[in-house]
Amino acid sequence: MTLNHRVPTGVISLDENIQGGLPGGSMTLVAGNPGTGKTLLSGEFLHHGAELRENGLYVSLSEGRESFLEYMRRVGKDMTSPPASDHVDILDLLTVKEAGIDNLMEIILERIEEGGAERLVLDSFSSLANAYPEAIDVRVSLHILSKLVRSIGCTTLLVAEIPSGRETIGLGLEEFIVDGIITLRRRTRNGDMLRELEITKMRGTEIGQPTQLFTLHGGFNVLPPFAETPITNPARFRHIPDQPERLSTGHEQLDSILGGFRRGDTILIELGEDIPSLILGLLVGTMRANFITGGGGVLMIPPGGESVERITRLDERFGLTEEERGRLLRIAVMRPEERPPPYVINVDPDDIKKSVRTWDDEKTRLLATTGKPILKIAYIDKAYSLWPMEHTKRALDVESMLTKAEGGLLVLLVRPGSEDLARHSSNISGAHLSLTNEQGVILFRGIRPRTQLYALEMNGDGGYPRLRFTPIR
């Protein structure tokens, strides 16, 4: 085993987490219950090796050659076409188990040497281990295999099945011989399925995160913690047209997921702990940009601690101009600058009636100026911190009814600690969305309408910041 030489698995965020890949010539156990993605991870490992012109050997002891090929084909990895067909050898031993376990090991060792394998997958090692009458025989054979692959620098994955209903590997002896152990799990969270990868052992490796989330959407993909992505070739936000009965979210993917929002709808976005401000900026900022680039007005109450300057900086990244902001945007603040820009309005933190009148006056001006429905965005826990709960609820009820008549959108955002207000807001909302933080990965789901779980990542390919919604499957 060569600690300084790293063999990338091809799963980018996994490789980044283990110093660039598996130690060269190492032997790693990949364990999990049925359906957790063990074979897919192993196939990605071999396919990526083929892309690097490294020879690989897949030894099938459980499902057979055709099942493996079809499984990989479904995620866009054709193992029968170059480069995989040139560099990956598939040894199907399902039909020759009757030859005896010693003969099986001899066949495997010969094929490794003949093909000059640099990557090896044994799927599954559990099937091989169960064929031995004694546990000591498993250890002896594993020692022989380990000695060979290390001597030729062949990096090996041993796939092990954890029986359904159990969480431990259960084979015992081999866990002391292997250099690394990666365990794949599924768990349920608020009715949604999450997939987790845990690295419990990786000899000679600094592990960034012991546990990572992953998805099987489009292959085996480990989800990175949310991070800002640089924008190359800046461009103006591209407006997404509205439909006769529905308004665009400003996100093509989110429009596909939700079908847009009904005209006149109130939308509640419930926020969990530790949601980065950039996520919120991209989610509602994109809605804001879509309204403004379509000539519609936007009226908003930002969250506490969010400056007008930060909001306008994001608008500039969308390509919005100062003229557009002055004409189409109104940001309500409690204590504005001495000479605020034209898009900043003052609301009185001590007088809810006066604040509502100011809000209504600006809304009337925007409706008259644009001749179009407007987008209203409010962080309602900020209002609750200033005004009595019953007054805040009454103001929300009235604004929700007015929004239906106006045909625009009212987006309400609520942070943890305002559960009573969140329940009330959910009752008046046509759509209820949720954002949570799980190990640094920001998860999105629709509560109403019900959607599957998505991981959010920043995408700057189009010339301006956008969110990418990756299904958790």
Whereabouts are the PLM-identified features?
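Loop/turn-to-beta-strand initiation segments
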Residues: 55, 87, 116-119, 151-159, ...
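Short hydrophobic/aromatic beta-strand immediately N-terminal to the Walker A/P-loop
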Residues: 27-31, 266-272
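Conserved P-loop
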Residues: 33-92, 274-342
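Conserved nucleotide-binding/hydrolysis micro-motifs of P-loop NTPases
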Residues: 62-66, 95-98, 126-127, 162-166, ...
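Charged, amphipathic alpha-helical linker segments immediately N-terminal to NTP-binding catalytic cores
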Residues: 1-2, 206-243
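Phosphate-binding/switch region of NTP-binding enzymes
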Residues: 155-219, 408-473
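Pre-Walker A adenine-sensing motif
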Residues: 9-21, 249-261
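Phosphate-binding/switch loop-helix module in NTP-utilizing enzymes
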Residues: 93-150, 338-401
